[in-house]
Every structure is written in C-alpha cells, then in structure tokens.
Amino acid sequence: MDPKAYSEAVAALVGARHSNPFAFLGPHEGRAEGGRGGFCIRCFRPKATAVSLISAADDTVLGRMKRLHPDGLFGIDLPEAPGALAYRLRVSEGDEDRDIEDPYRFGPVLGELDRHLLGEGTHLDIYRKMGAHPMTRDGVRGTGFALWAPNATRVSVIGDFNGWDGRLHPMRAHPGSGVWDIFLPGVVEGHLYKYELLGPDGSLLPAKADPYAFQAEKPPHTASVVRGLGTYAWNDGRWMSERADRVATSAPVSIYEVHLGSWRHGGGDRSLSYREMAEQLIPYVKEMGFTHIELLPVSEFPFDGSWGYQPIGLFAPTSRFGEPDDFRHFVDRCHQEGVGVILDWVAGHFPEDAHGLSWFDGTHLYEHSDPRQGRHMDWGTYIFNYGRNEVRNFLLANALFWLEQFHIDGLRVDAVASMLYLDYSRKAGEWVPNKFGGRENLEAIDFLRRMNELVYGRFPGAVTIAEESTAWPMVSRPVHLGGLGFGYKWNMGWMNDTLSYMSQDPIYRRFHQHDLSFGLLYAFTENFVLPLSHDEVVHGKRSILGRMPGDAWQQFANLRAYYGFMWTHPGKKLLFMGCEFAQGREWNHNASLDWHLLDIDWHKGVQALVRDLNGLYAGVPALHDRDTEGYGFSWIDCTDADQSVLAFLRFGETAEDVVMVVCNFTPNPRHGYRLGAPIAGRWREIFNTDSAHYGGSNMGNSVVETEETKSHGHAQSVVLTLPPLATIVLRPDGPITRIA
C-alpha cells in the first residue's frame, strides 16, 4: 500500500467513514504502516491503551502491537504470511485486560450465490442469510450480520456488546449487490443491536433496527435482539396433515378475530402473554365453536395505537407478549386443539419511524422516491416499491417465513385495494399512471400473484385472504386463470350494506330491502368471507350492538336476528372479539374486553347464540357445503319489503339436504305467513334466534306440515309464525314425500 493510500485509509477509518474496512483491518500483505513487503495485522480499538497479538493455540504472546494512530489504530508486522493463523487480541482498556477475537480475520457471511439471488429477487429463504444469525466459525461462537443498504457509504453493527460505538465494527461491503456483512465473535443470543449507517453524502443517519431481525426489544425500546431461528419441537403433525380440509370452500370456516393486547388482561391491566393466551384463549375459542383465530398483526410495531398495522420488524413476533418460541407454543397449542391460526399481514405500507425502513440508507430504498407513488397521505406511511427486486424478495420471503417458521395456517393481506390502485385515495394530479396510462399498480399485482403462487405451492393447506374493498375482478381465482390467486376475499360490500340496513329503524327498513338482497347478485363471483371486523367497532362507528335501533330489548333482538342471517348467508364467517357477547362500547385497544357483561342475561344470551350458530353452521352441511357456489342457494322470497321479511333456501350435496331460512326484521310477529317449500312433508324448526335461551320471546313453530298449496314456485307450502326481530331455520323432518 503506497503512503497516500495508507494515509487515506487511516483517515477514513479513524473518522468512521471507511467503506471497506476488511481491506485494511485484520491480516494483510504489506507492512502495518503501509510499506511494501512482508505481512501485517491491524486492529482499531479507540479505547485501548495497548494491544497484543495472542496465539489461540497456546495463549502465548506473539508480539505487542504498535500504536499507528493516537485514535486507536494498532498494527504488527509478521515475519511470514498469517495463513491459517488463529489468533486473538489482548486488549488493555483502563485497568482491564481481556482477550477478544478479531472480526476482521473471518471471511464473508454471505456467499456470491446468495447475493446474486437477492439481486434477482428470487432468494425465497433470504431470511436465513440476512439479518443476525448465531453461528460458529473456525470453532469461534458469534453472530453473522448481513444488511442490504446499497447507497450507504459505511455500515456498522452497534450494540450493547460494543458500547453502541459505530467505529468498532464497520461491515464488509460487497460492491454490486449492496450487501454488507460481518461475523462478530462473542455476540450471542439476547444481545441488543442496531445498524449505524452513513448516507451517500457521508452524513450520519438515525440508527436502524434490523429489517430481518427475529426479535426486537419490547416497545417503546427499538433495538433488535440477536435471536436464531431456533429448534422448536412441534407437536402439530396431525393438524398440519389435515388442515387443508379445515379451510376448504366446502368447510364450515368460522373465524374469531383477536387483538392479543386487549382480549383479556391479567392483574393490573397487564396484557396476557403468548403462553397465557394459550391457556385461556384457545379453550374459549373451542367452546365457542370457532374454527380459526385471526390475529391482528403480530409483526413488531412501535405504536400501540396502530394495532400492528404499521409494522417495522416484519420477521419478529412482537415482544409485548413474549419471545418467538412463546408464540410458536401458542400456535402449536392451537393446532393440537384443532384450531387454525391466521395472521393479518401488512405488505402495503410501513411507518415513517426513524429506526425503521424509511429513508433506510439515506435514499428511498424500500419506498418510491416520488411521493405520488411512495406515500399514503391519509395514513402518513410509505408504500413499498414492489418493482425493486430486493424489496419484493424481502416481502415474499416474509410471507413464507411465517408459514414455515411458525406453522401459520393463513395470511389475511391487509389493505389490498391500496396496493392495486395507483390513484387510491388520491385526487387528479396526485398519482402517476402505469406504463399503459392506467391506474392499476402493475408491480403490486405481479407481487400479489407471485406471493399467492408461492404460498399455495409451498405450503399445502395454507390459505390467503384479501381485504379488498373494490370490485376488482377474480381476486380469489387462480393466477393461471387471470386471478390474483387468493383463497378468499372479505365481502366488504355485504358488510357495509347489511350494517346500513340493520341501523335503520324497522319502520323504514321497507325502503332498504335491497341492502340485504343485493349481495346475492355477486355472492358467488368470489370465495367470500363475511367480516364483522375490528374496523367496524372503532372511530365513532359504535359497537355492533350500538348500531342496532330501538330500546334494549329491540337492540339485542336485532343483533340476534342479524347474526342468524349472517351465519345462514353464503360465505365464511368472521367475528371480532367482544361482538360474540354484544359488547356495548367501542373497542379500546388499551383496555380488556368487558367480560363482566356476561353477568347480564342478555349478553350471556348473545354469547350462547353465537356458540350455537357455530354449531349449526358446522353441523348442517347445507349451510357450508356450497358456501361459494350459486347452486347452494335459492331465494324463496326477497321481495316482501313491506313486511321486511326475507326467505331463502340453502342446499348441500343432495336434493334432500336443504334448509329454509326466514328472517323477520320488524318487531311485529307474523302469523300465518305462507312460504313455498321445495319438499313436501314435515319441516322442523332447528334454530330460532328468538328462543328464550338467547333472551328472546320464545315464539316459534316447532314442527309444521306442508300444505298442497302452490306458493313461490313450489307445489307445496308451509304456514309459519315469524317471531319478532328474529331469524328461524327449518329443515325436512321425517319421510320425504315429494320434491318439487
């Protein structure tokens, strides 16, 4: 190394701006002070008063290193090439001498193939390489770190193991790939760390959490935690082999949506841990008859008020409730008890917190640089740049990570509409058209299709669900047929229309009958989930119970009738926690659900109703076999708006497998109400939301016999009593004499 290059390297190193420290530190040809010939070892220890070279084989002192610069650069000349010399550094700092391994004698953490595949966007197991990974190299325990930051001019690992000093452990740059890596001996699981970066202009950026970290500090702290993938011993083999049947379009899928932090609190308003949730939530879900739990996002997030929808640590289950293996335990226990686990997954945007992904290397790395493409103005968040290979790879690998490492059964993808449309929530002039001049986000579409192909191709029995609020076609149709490839789509239109209807005073419902019937015009164009989610019980919308009109009796009766309509309507079911017992106030993420309400009979009655509706849904094939098929449904009458009555049939696999559903959405009982019946003989009432068991007036029908009076296109009919504000379900009972 010539004197000029040596001087420049020393200045860059002590100034904490050297972009390639491995070219200078550690063992090298040449003299320690830059002369030609021979071999040397250099190290940089700013706080050291002396450094000696120690043989790792026999602990003998090989020589005292010379101070090459007053700021802490030391070096020693060797008579021959270090070769495979295993050495340590004995560092004197103050009154303490300690032996440390030299990170700069170890080779790269990432291989050339890994870097190439990341650049292509095809390294689907990239989380096994990027981030922090405990490992042993040449018999030395430590952690390998790897980060993608192509525009940074220096990247260092900082942590509680080096005093958060960015001068100590600058990383190796891999030109052309944007990857930086280093192996740090002695850094083990549990250590805290971040990355310190200099931007393209050499300015110091806010310290960044690791995008690929498997654990983070418990908020409000923001450091990453060194944590390996682990060797958790799963006990859910039977579930994993059978789970495909549990989420099929012909299966009775009933999902309980849960926010872990507020479902139930322990002592002193403390949220339950993952392991406590396993002991309390799972038995409750089983007792209530739900088939799956859907968790609001568990990926680490800084702001409690985002409910997890503004994540930063996409590969780290939030530390609010425990460690990663604690979350694995929760999922494992769910599976052992026959309950599936679906995660809300956020791939549409990320927050602007300084320690997160925004402006990561001093440039718009994960987001678009143009705010017309890269900013959600409504939410104050950034939009992922799906057209950048490394960003797409990051997200695809993350989706697969949860399914592989945590045995998650499905991903409910949040805010899909915001991903699909370039003009989503934007005025004219505030968005950039695609290359064809349209408003479709072609890169996001390609990303979603690829994600779905990978999920279904790699993980049999897993499912993806889209929260998509527009009329985008074929969301839940296969990619090879031109669809987006999701398994299911939330039916936001059904939810909005039916809640609008139920909020009307019964006097005016006759003018809004179409709000209940319109959904059947498109009910089978997608594989739908009917969602009453967390979004419907916040921000002044009131609780579901609070939207029901009338006095207390009518509110509860309305709610019971509505749930009866929902559970018998085509589509899978989703209910947010607390709605199953008619919580009266809006959901508050900082407070536990109001479990004390179950001391009141009306609330206890709604809880019993939901439990029994789940049992009905699972036990009557006609209510789930053909949930997504048009020939599993037929109207008897959807036009009796004057009396606010709806009647329809649900069919299973055989003509005899049929149920009749009748809804009366007024507080007036209807006596002598005639409806056509497809099967002659006796019909038994098998469910009635007006049952006294649920808090109703106990008006009903028990068993009715068909009469040979034509009605509604059928050769026979039944005459029913319709309870007030109620849904009833009937099915053939006994010998069938005629089907017509």
Curated annotation (Swiss-Prot):
One Gene Ontology biological process: glycogen biosynthetic process
Enzyme Commission (EC) number: 2.4.1.18
Superkingdom of origin organism: Bacteria
Pathway stated in the Swiss-Prot or TrEMBL entry: Glycan biosynthesis; glycogen biosynthesis
Catalysis: reaction(s): Transfers a segment of a (1->4)-alpha-D-glucan chain to a primary hydroxy group in a similar glucan chain
Tagged with keyword Glycosyltransferase: yes
GO CC entries: cytosol
InterPro entries in the cross-refs: A-amylase/branching_C (IPR006048), Branching_enzy (IPR037439), GlgB (IPR006407), GlgB_N (IPR054169), GlgB_N_E_set_prok (IPR044143), Glyco_hydro_13_cat_dom (IPR006047), Glyco_hydro_13_N (IPR004193), Glyco_hydro_b (IPR013780)
GO molecular function, one term: hydrolase activity, hydrolyzing O-glycosyl compounds
Family: Belongs to the glycosyl hydrolase 13 family. GlgB subfamily.
Subunit relationships: Monomer.
Protein name: 1,4-alpha-glucan branching enzyme GlgB
This protein's encoding gene: glgB
